[in-house]
Amino acid sequence: MTDQIAQNSARPAWETSDHIDDQVVNELRQKFGPDAFTFQPTRTGMPVVWVKREQLIEVMQYLKSLPKPYVMLYDLHGVDERVRTHRQGLPAADFSVFYHLISLDRNKDIMLKVALSEKDLNLPTLTSIFPNSNWYEREVWDMFGIVFNGHPNLRRIMMLPNWEGHPLRKDYPARATEFDPYVLTKQKEDLEMESLTFKPEEWGMKRGTENEDFMFLNLGPNHPSSHGAFRIILQLDGEEIVNCVPDVGYHHRGAEKMGERQSWHSYIPYTDRIEYLGGCVNEMPYVLAVEKLAGIEVPERVKVIRVMLSELFRINSHLLYISTFIQDVGAMTPVFFAFTDRQKVYDIVEAITGFRMHPAWFRIGGVAHDLPKGWERLLREFLDWMPKRLDSYVKAALQNSILKGRTIGVASYNAKEALDWGVTGAGLRATGVEFDVRKWRPYSGYENFEFEIPVASNGDCYDRVMLKVEELRQSLRILEQCYKNMPAGPFKADHPLTTPPPKERTLQHIETMINHFLQVSWGPVMPANESFQMVEATKGINSYYLTSDGSTMSYRTRIRTPSFAHLQQIPAVIRGSLVSDLIVYLGSIDFVMSDVDR
C-alpha cells in the first residue's frame, strides 16, 4: 500500500492524463485488442475508458475476475452530452453512462464510459455482476430516461412514481419559475396517494402461503427509528422479517441539478447540506475537485486548517451517532451528555468560521479567512475534556450487558458482501477491510499525520458502533497534531482562480480588482476538463465528480454519497431477523436522509 501511495502522490493532482501507462490499461489492451477503447485524458486521477455497449458486460466480468480484481462498483450515473462543446476526441454521444470501479488490491480506480444515442437509450443491467447497480440504474433511468435491459424492477427511486420527465436532462427546467403554477386538486392528491400504495406483486413478493398470510407493515416515512423521511415496507411472518423494500426519495432536493445553475463558488453552501451533520467535511471533496480543475496548489496552512475543521465535524457527527444508537437500543441519558459535548465542538467551529452546522467556509484555493485569535485555547480545552467523556460513554453504556445482547451478532455481514453492496466507512472496516481514504489516498496533507485505522472482524452492529468510538479517539490525535503543528503562512493560494482573490491586492492592482469583481459577480471560469475527489467523510466515502465545459458553472456535478449504498444493502442483511433487530441495524448504519436523497 505504501508503494502505491507514493506512486499516486508522484503525479500532481491537477495534471491532465489519460493514464495509458496504468497496468489495467495494458491488461485490457491485451485482452480486447489495442484499438478496442478510447482513452480520455482527464484530471480524475484514474484511467477513463470509453467502451462499446456490446462489450460492457464482458469488460466488467473481466475486470472483476483479474488476479487483482476491481471488486467494488463505487458509482454509476449518467451525463447529458447534447449541449457539451468541449468533447474533442471522444465518441459521438447524446448521453453517456459512466461506471466507476475500485480495486483494493491495487488501490486503483478505473472509469468506464458508454456512449448512447438519444434514439437508442438502453444498456444491459449489471445487477448479476454487481448487485448494488440496482439502485444506481434506477436513478439513472429516473434522472435521464436511460433503460437498463434485464433490470429486475426498473422504476423511479428519487421522484414520485407518476412524475413526468427526467430532471437531469439539459432540456428539463432547473427553476420553479420555468414551470407552470402548481395546483394540487383533490383528484390529483388522491392519485398521488394511490401511487404510493405498496403492491407486493410488483416486487416479486407473495401475500401469503397456503397456510398463512403475510403482514405488510410500513415503517416510516414518519417514524423515530427511521432517522428521517425514510420508509421501509416490511413483509412479516409474525415478528420475523421475510423481506423488505426500502423506499427513499422523500428528501430529494435536486442537489446535482442545482450544481448546473450555480457558479463554482456559489455552490459551496449547498455542499454543507448534502449530509447536514458533516459541515466542512462535505465541502472538502468539492473544493479539492474544483482546485484540480483550476490547477491550484494550496498553502500548507490551508491544508492543516481544513483537516482540523473536518476532524471537528467528524467528532461532532460521531457523537450524535453513538448517542442515538444507544437511544435506539433503549437508553436515553447518553444523548443529553452527547449534546453537551457537541456544543463544545460547535463553539470552536463558530469561533473560527462564524457559523455552526453549515459554515460554507472552505474556498476555492483556501478558506474564507484566517484563524482567529484564541482558537488554540478553545481547542486545547476541548482536547483536555473529551477523552474522559469518551471513556464514560463506553463504561456507562457501550459495555452494558443489555446493549451487548441486543447488538452482538445482529445484522452482520462479511467483507465480500460489503464490497458487493458498495459499503464504505466503518461499515466496511467492521468486516476487517482496512480501507480509509485518509490513509490509502491521502488528501489535504493527511499523509503528514499520525493516526491508526480501527478495524473489527465480526461486521455486526456492536462492531460498527465501537469502531466509531475508536475513530473518535483517532480524530482527537489528529486535532492534537493540528494544535501543535499549525504552519504559518497565507490562508489562500496565490492563483488567478482562487475565489475570491486575496482582498488586499485589489487595492493595489487594477487587474486584480477587475478579476475580483468578475469572480464575485459571475464566478470563475474553470478550464474544460473533468476532475474527481473522494474523501473519508463522516459516514463513509463521499465524492464529487465534476465536468467543466469551460464555463462559470459546472456542466455536470455528480455527488456520490455513502448512505445511498448503505440503505440499498438493508434487505440482504436483515432478512430472517426480527423487527427489533431492524431497529438496531438502522441505528448502526449511521445515515441521514439528506445524504441518501441529495
Curated annotation (Swiss-Prot):
Chief subcellular location: membrane
Chain residue ranges for the region called NADH dehydrogenase I subunit C: 1-189
Catalytically driven reaction(s): a quinone + NADH + 5 H(+)(in) = a quinol + NAD(+) + 4 H(+)(out)
EC code: 7.1.1.-
Pfam family, one: Complex1_30kDa
GO cellular component: NADH dehydrogenase complex; plasma membrane
Localization (cell): Cell inner membrane
Presence of keyword Nucleotide-binding: no
Keywords: Cell inner membrane, Cell membrane, Membrane, Multifunctional enzyme, NAD, Quinone, Translocase, Transport, Ubiquinone
Gene Ontology MF annotations: NAD binding; NADH dehydrogenase (ubiquinone) activity; NADH:ubiquinone reductase (non-electrogenic) activity; quinone binding
Subunit structure: NDH-1 is composed of 13 different subunits. Subunits NuoB, CD, E, F, and G constitute the peripheral sector of the complex.
Name this polypeptide is given: NADH-quinone oxidoreductase subunit C/D
